[in-house]
Amino acid sequence: WLANLSRLNVCSQKGLSERFDSTIGRGTVLMPFGGKNQLTPTEGMVARLPVLKGITNAASVMACGYNPEVACWSPFHGAMYAVVESVCRAVALGADPDKIHLTLQEYFPKLNNTETWGQPFSALLGAFMAQDALKIAAIGGKDSMSGTFMDKTVPPTLVSFAVSVIDSEKAISTEFKTAGNNVIFIAAPRDEHEVIDFEVLRKNLRVLHQAIIANKVASVGVIKEGGIAAAVSVMCLGNSLGFEFIKPFNDTDSLFTLQPGGFVVELADGLSPEDLFADIEYINLGHLTNSKLISLNETEITLDNITSAYLKPLETIFPRIVDAGAKVAEINQPLYKESLPLTAPYSIAKPRVFIPVFPGINCEYDTAAAFEAAGGIAEVFVVRNLTAVEINDSMDTMVKMINNCQILMLPGGFSAGDEPDGSGKFIATMFRNKKIQEAVNTLLQERDGLMLGICNGFQALIKLGLVPYGEIVDMRQDSPTLTFNKIGRHVSQIVETKIISNKSPWLNFVEPGDIHSIAVSHGEGRFYAPEAEIKRLFANGQIATQYVDQNGAPTMQMPFNPNGSLYAVEGITSPDGRVFGKMGHSERYVPGLMKNIHGNKDQKIFISGVKYFD
């Protein structure tokens, strides 16, 4: 069982996936890994379609299929199963099987003899057979016949991508949800030539889809390499649920067999399969438990052992965590509570929010949408730096827009490609221009304005001294900084942060002790400062948020503290709280997103900033 989970085509690739930003665009319906532990991989991508104004529930679905071991044995079967796998994974996410299209990507060795010419030919026949039987067409693709270098060749490769559009409210994730729920297996029979019975498969897909859109199914996993055993194990990990197979379970060998077109299905609310799947064949597998064990006849396997076997194989190549180093004493500081909400001395119905976009920034659309949804007027300006004249013109425009706004927002991204020796330097250099610096000082000190920096914007605020000092100053030896993540790479995931202090207008709508699930995506987010300076900031209520574990305790340990920030610091403020810098992308959430992640995801930062001017 454990050896099966440790195979390279079965084991976790989470450490690789986290290198890629999964939440940009404010449309991620399902995170790549779901459950409270974020360990169960999602069957594919579900994201709302991007719109400049408002919100849509229309979401795109994309799922892939390919098994290199099958393709090496038979390119025909490899391509046929690839189409089937991609379609099944799309249906498992909520797609209608009658509204799926495909795109195929092919990659084969150099075609220098009769045998190698037969590989793409047989693969295309297998793919066409599956498409014809499922009544699903491939409407695009790409191919390459250059997969040979000296004596090295790629396996015969035809990767199928299934694409569809769904209502994001109907999207369903892979991790098991609730103890007590029944779990079944739906199979697609194969003949003596290992060809799938497509008539049965089409019926299975339609019946399963109807159950999903009727909210009768809690989770669905597609059988891939590793068989039912791997599917059940991985689906348990997300929420630390155990599984008890029916007793006796006699056909244990079938648990490890590749069964293309098969599904593991968790029924919702203790429903019985007889009520939902009377028209198709299925097998009762068992039910979910709170035991943190997988029980098969007289054998019990702990989830701890399963987790270790599943995560360990690629940990040295694509690590998920690194040692946090020496423990920091007094990391758990008292909460700082401001008794009265902080408000502006004047009222503006729709405050203007100026969002300058520097080269490499990519969060301006998400940020503008968040402020406008809260009632503000977002004004986005793209800084031009192609020539000296354009830079000067951009600075003049920035001065005018700062003088005309109530809120200055520095969004996240990768300013100047996160240039060497620290990101955010280009932004900080621009803001140290005398005219811009005077405009910022006027906004903050004379007009009681607000300033917010997220991710790259936080890095710029730190380099300018706006946090924690409240004004643009030269950096001192003991000034806080943000440096490279302890793990030495980009990290994209959801973390939990706790409100430590509400001494800021940006936190008027939350209470100290509140915990939120927030997206992070950065390579340089590790907060560092001398211990005396950190304690001074705590005492002054300027440490606004900390990374916390599943028990709500501040921690230095990954993955809860994704970058190794000292004292688990995620966000800090200026002395008066009107300038706030944080790493987590609070702007990337709207209701209906990140459905496979637990917790309160609305930090109410943007509504707090806008309502400050009521």
Sequence positions of predicted segments:
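Intein/HINT protein-splicing elements and their conserved insertion hotspots or analogous self-processing inserts
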Residues: W1-A58, Y66-A71, E115-S122, A137-Q259, ...
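Conserved phosphate/anionic-ligand binding catalytic regions in large, soluble enzymes, centered on
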Residues: Q38, V87-D96, E175, S219-M235, ...
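General beta-strand structural signal in soluble alpha/beta enzymes
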Residues: V46-R48, V61-A63, L102, I139-G141, ...
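Short coil-to-beta-strand
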Residues: K53-A63, A95-H101, N181-V183, I407-L408, ...
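A glycine-rich phosphate/pyrophosphate-binding beta-strand-loop-alpha-helix module
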Residues: C72-D143, G147
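Short hydrophobic/aromatic beta-strand micro-patches
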Residues: V264-A268
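Amide-donor transfer/coupling interface in amidating biosynthetic enzymes
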Residues: L285, D393, T397-M398, A439-T442, ...
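N-terminal beta1-alpha1 cap of cysteine-dependent amidohydrolase-like domains
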Residues: E298-I454, F458-Y469, T483-V491, K498, ...
